[in-house]
């Protein structure tokens, strides 16, 4: 999905697990002025403030904050599909600082831009500065934001390089023999799950780490090992 994302500078299979594939980068980033390395940036209008996942690895709820709400408003990190500030897509939930805009409350069409991810980094040091995510519609059941579904642009503003990526919502395909069926990013405090395709009938996608055909260790502001699985 998250070349994660989340939230990486690249965790493996994608940007922010394709727009949410930079989990470790959203947990600790440099703020807009660079004065506090533990801060996360202030939310932009209509951006989601956190990404929640009910984790099939250990049944825990993992939370990836992306920005800080303003005006004394807090970003809820509790799973609640009925609070008016959440969009739920299967085991994922996007949280907003205020009520979800009405323009989002419809199912994505095949041609529609479903999600926009904006990544800011220092153009010299490549240090990740901020991630802003914007939903444009609701991705229906059995669909997701696959890694190959995006296009994007790059611009430079002052000392920052800004990458804008646009994702489409697509129905998950049946895995081929050499496809990654899902990836498990295991960190010191968080575990992120990304499903890439559905295994053929009679096969399953394993969760045992020893079954991974590929592992990748990544250390930036946090430490993650990504385990890529194939259908068995």
Swiss-Prot record:
GO cellular component, one term: extracellular region
One of the record's GO molecular function terms: toxin activity
Expression tissues: Expressed by the venom gland.
Source domain of life: Eukaryota
Residues annotated as signal peptide: 1-21
Main location group: secreted
Homology family: Belongs to the scoloptoxin-11 family.
Name of the molecule in the record: U-scoloptoxin(11)-Ssd2a
Record organism: Scolopendra dehaani
